[in-house]
């Protein structure tokens, strides 16, 4: 009878959630979401924090709704997305890496009791990548360098989406800030907004293309022999990935802060590009890539 009661109580606890203290770890459905979500899952698990994995749950609206509803407890989000969560997209604060992070943290804590932990240094925003041979030969590292190179007659032909080429916030903003202008002959507009296509065009030098519209941490950048030009004047909003966690959960498991901080601190642009590339290009499983990275950095055993 005692065993029957215990079993019934356990079943009730599972249904109500009253006795289940597992931290539900989730992420977005894209490649980087899979890598980052699995990093969080692996590190918490290695730290003896009980977890349940719901990695690559869906797009931004799905995971956002899930965490505000308490259906998941932690997932990696991008600082720049808070501009749209809170209808502040016109503010320049999102172009400053630190100020944008602080504003996101402040708004989400007040509105939703969500805590933003320290973000990675990597910035997954709109960018321009150039073939590495050209960048190395001309010492091109930043958008200021690229602007001077183009303005001085440097041979650049860029593949991009129609939105990137025409949106005032994208290529036109880069051109006005960095003092260059690409003619129609220097542009190849590809349908859709797929950076895989623009990267492939630059890698294969399709129609003479040697530069591409990218997102900063795209996994195909490095394997395709491209290098991202740093947006040194902060033209674009900054999208730094950071774990966000329900405050109630963080109060129960405060060690989450300490164990995740060194993980995200190691995720610079080049590191995330390589990790994403192992999944996108190399075909490895996101969890295997995450685990291998954490072990190689001494963050888990």
Give residue ranges: language-model regions.
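Sec/Tat signal peptide C-region and signal peptidase I cleavage site
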Residues: 16-21
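Contiguous mixed-secondary-structure segments that line small-molecule binding/active-site clefts
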Residues: 79-172, 176, 180, 184, ...
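Glycine/small-residue-rich interface belts in oligomeric ring/scaffold proteins
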Residues: 51-90, 94
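Short helix-initiation/N-cap motifs at beta->coil->alpha
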Residues: 31, 54-65, 162, 183-200
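Short, polar/charged alpha-helical segment
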Residues: 31-50, 172, 176-178
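Short helices/loops that flank or line small-molecule/ion binding pockets
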Residues: 42-43, 61-72, 88, 177, ...
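Extracytoplasmic "Venus flytrap"
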Residues: 22-40, 55-59, 163-166
């Amino acid at each position: 009878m005692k065993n029957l009661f215990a079993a019934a109580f356990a079943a009730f606890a599972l249904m109500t959630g009253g006795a289940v203290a597992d931290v539900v770890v989730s992420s977005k459905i894209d490649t980087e979401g899979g890598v980052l979500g699995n990093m969080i899952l692996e590190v918490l698990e290695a730290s003896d924090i009980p977890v349940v994995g719901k990695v690559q749950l869906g797009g931004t609206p799905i995971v956002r709704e899930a965490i505000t509803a308490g259906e998941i407890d932690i997932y990696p989000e991008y600082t720049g997305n808070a501009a749209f969560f809170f209808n502040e997209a016109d503010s320049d604060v999102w172009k400053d890496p630190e100020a944008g992070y602080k504003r996101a943290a402040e708004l989400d804590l007040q509105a939703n009791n969500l805590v933003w932990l320290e973000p990675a240094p990597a910035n997954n925003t709109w960018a321009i990548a150039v073939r590495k041979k050209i960048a190395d030969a001309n010492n091109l590292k930043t958008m200021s360098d690229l602007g001077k190179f183009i303005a001085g007659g440097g041979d650049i032909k860029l593949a991009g989406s129609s939105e990137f080429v025409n949106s005032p916030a994208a290529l036109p903003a880069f051109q006005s800030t960095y003092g260059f202008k690409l003619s129609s002959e220097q542009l190849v507009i590809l349908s859709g907004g797929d950076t895989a296509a623009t990267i492939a065009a630059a890698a294969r030098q399709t129609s003479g293309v040697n530069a591409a519209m990218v997102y900063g941490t795209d996994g195909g950048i490095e394997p395709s022999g491209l290098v991202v030009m740093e947006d040194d004047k902060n033209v674009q909003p900054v999208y730094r990935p950071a774990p966000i966690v329900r405050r109630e959960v963080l109060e129960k498991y405060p060690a989450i802060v300490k164990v995740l901080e060194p993980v995200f601190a190691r995720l610079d642009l080049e590191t995330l590009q390589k990790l994403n590339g192992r999944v996108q290009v190399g075909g490895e499983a996101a969890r295997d890539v995450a685990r291998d990275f954490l072990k190689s950095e001494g963050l888990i055993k």
